[in-house]
Amino acid sequence: MVSIAFYGGIPGGISTPITQQSEKSKCEENTMFQPYCYNNDSKNSMAESKEARDQEMNLKEESKEEKRRNDWWKIGMFLLCLAGTTGGILWWYEGLPQQHYIGLVAIGGRLNGSGQSNAIECWGSFPGCRPFENYFSYETNRSMHMDNNTATLLEAYHREITFIYKSSCTDSDHCQEYQCKKVNLSSSDSSNSVRVEDVMNTTEYWGFKWLECNQTENFKTILVPENEMVNINDTDTWIPKGCNETWARVKRCPIDILYGIHPIRLCVQPPFFLVQEKGIANTSRIGNCGPTIFLGVLQDNKGVVRGDYTACNVSRLKIDRKDYTGIYQVPIFYTCTFTNITSCNNESIISVIMYETNQVQYLLCNNNNSNNYNCVVQSFGVIGQAHLELPRPNKRIRNQSFNQYNCSINNKTELETWKLVNTSGITPLPISSEANTGLIRHKRDFGISAIVAAIVAATAIAASATMSYVALTEVNKIMEVQNHTFEVENSTLNGMDLIERQIKILYAMILQTHADVQLLKERQQVEETFNLIGCIERTHVFCHTGHPWNMSWGHLNESTQWDDWVSKMEDLNQEILTILHGARNNLAQSMITFNTPDSIAQFGKDLWSHIGNWIPGLGASIIKYIVMFLLIYLLLTSSPKILRALWKVTSGAGSSGSRYLKKKFYHKHASREDTWDQAQHNIHLAGVTGGSGDKYCKQKYSRNDWNGESEEYNRRPKSWVKSIETFGESYISEKTKGEISQPGAAINEHKNGSGRNNPHQGSLDLEIRSEGGNIYDCCIKAQEGTLAIPCCGFPLWLFWGLVIIVGRIAGYGLRGLAVIIRICIRGLNLIFEIIRKMLDYIGRALNPGTSHVSMPQYV
């Protein structure tokens, strides 16, 4: 009889070999090593052991399958989280006010200085100025060429402001000589009376020294501070300050002009520009307008304050004077308290504009202490090149207000630094611009649109990670799409180049027209000015300087040149239309080819590469480079995990669906397998015992191993095989019959790991094709390219990714802070240790352990 050993190849069996036992052993003993001992107790133990082991194996397979199934989701979600974080940071950055940003502006080739000061006009909301709001200002490190006769803003300021006052105020020659004598003003403590005394050595009263001046022609005597007058040749002849520097004398002006609160700008139009040499590393500022200036701010010293009506109080003083003839103009005294005043050039005397409805006064104030000022009403003023005698109010100002400006406004030095330049070409000039100057320019397109494009590109890349094998099979199609796309880009660039040529021609036409108009305007204004006041500036035409007029604007023959320009514009129009038509055809062909998810994924990669090309040109802002550094750091630290997860996804993509369906198949046919195992068990017993229980137990209790050579088994091999074939005819395939007919060989092949597939693989394949799989179908469809973008769990992963990134950044910051604190503690400990040793050394030196000093003894 042949004995057979089973090594776990039959479902329900275990790996421990089945051996024959002695007759002294009982059937109930060692049932753990004899799973086919046919009794109820051992059968129950066998079933329980099988079920526990199968559950454990199923749990392990489910955990591995779950891990592999989630890996590709993690990759996509990580990329989306990274894109979302980057977009959030850049969104926040784009919302911040930026004072400088890099850009290009075509302002002209060589910038030459120009003496054409009439090109500088008054632009603003003030009557007499042109309405204009498109102010711009740039900074550049380009050196500017200046001619010696270059006009400055100071000259234009004198001309424009003087023209406003000359045309708006009453003309009067008040800059005549006054016969003045020095006087002292003194007052008694008991009264408000002030006496006027003629003395040689004067003292200050109310913070000023005083003059009593007579103008014989007008029968007028004025009591005025010395600060308002200028002495001539150490005589008793004085004139108002500023008369020698001005040429327009006006007396009475409308109140709105004297208010001093009208802001204006001096601006130019192309082809002219204003340049301010800053003197720092050859940097310059170029723009179409100068700084904002104000009409009513006096020229010498302009500390002007704004406060409430309680800032200044009138001191009602009575002037005791000698007999006089005509008009005697007495000063008006104020005591003021200013807390936010700014003095120019660190001078103690300042000018203050104080106004109310229909009245205005200029106060000349002397600083008494930190915040207290003694002020008097001024008599004369200089605004531009207009010298005017300030009006005297009919009454004391009540509920007065004050206007405050910086000391630099209307500063002569600043206005002299702005010079007029002109150009006639178009040359890109690298500059940085201030965003608050009003220029209609935008930041580089790395804002919201680029963020959206980056998120779309990252999503496409995440989806293409699961469709890579599809994309690899259609490389030719992708290359064809790229070729069409490149052709579209080239056509667009060529069209833009032609449009730029058109713009250059159009710009030249505008410059020529503007030059002609500017020449006519210059001549008209010079004629008007010459007819009114004579030659007052370098005009290139009527002045005696003899500087020749630049005839470069008149070199072109208008009729010939304009016809040539028009013909060139028409030719360029035709070329542009042809190129754009070709670009449209290429784009249409590209869209026809561009119809698969893998092409979309490749387009996302190309889009991302184009966006990445913007990174080196983001500008000088350190914040953008910090953002890029953090993104690169995150990619470097996370790339090993991404690659490892991608490898797992690639290797496990084919088995994820089969594992799931295998598990599902097992649960569905578990009862059928149990029935088949029971049948095998019965067949085995029938073959071994031949229907005799005593003979089976006798064989079971023998000492010889059951190694497949039992005589009892060899007597009936055909009946055993026949029983198996009879039972399994309706269930297993022909291939399975052949394998079971030689159980030893099948078991050995299974144990060695080099055998064939599971006998039930055929029915498993049928189940895969016949039954679907809910969420796992999503995986399979995504791998096949029919599901383009994963969309499950995005908000959760996005939030979690943001939390992880912020936590990592905070963790590094806290660790750095801990290192700094540790270093500081070590430094402090070292310092304390050095101090301790020094003190200990000094203490030991001053208090030695043994004294060697002998004290004197007295007998």
From Swiss-Prot:
One of its GO terms (biological process) is symbiont entry into host cell. Keywords: Cleavage on pair of basic residues, Coiled coil, Disulfide bond, Glycoprotein, Host cell membrane, Host membrane, Host-virus interaction, Membrane, Transmembrane, Transmembrane helix, Viral attachment to host cell, Viral envelope protein, Virion, Virus entry into host cell. Residues 498-513 are annotated as: Immunosuppression. Specific enzymatic cleavages in vivo yield mature proteins. Envelope glycoproteins are synthesized as an inactive precursor that is N-glycosylated and processed likely by host cell furin or by a furin-like protease in the Golgi to yield the mature SU and TM proteins. The cleavage site between SU and TM requires the minimal sequence [KR]-X-[KR]-R. One of its GO terms (cellular component) is virion membrane. Residues 636-859 are cytoplasmic. Residues 576-624, 663-699 form a coiled coil. Residues 7-614 are extracellular. Glycans are attached at residues 40, 112, 141, 148, 184, 201, 214, 233, 244, 282, 313, 340, 346, 368, 399, 406, 411, 422, 483, 490, 550, 557. Residues 1-6 form a propeptide. InterPro entries: GP41-like (IPR000328), Gp90_EIAV (IPR001361). One of its GO terms (molecular function) is structural molecule activity. The mature envelope protein (Env) consists of a trimer of SU-TM heterodimers attached by noncovalent interactions or by a labile interchain disulfide bond. The surface protein (SU) attaches the virus to the host cell by binding to its receptor. This interaction triggers the refolding of the transmembrane protein (TM) and is thought to activate its fusogenic potential by unmasking its fusion peptide. Fusion occurs at the host cell plasma membrane. This is Envelope glycoprotein. It comes from Equine infectious anemia virus (isolate P3.2-2) (EIAV).
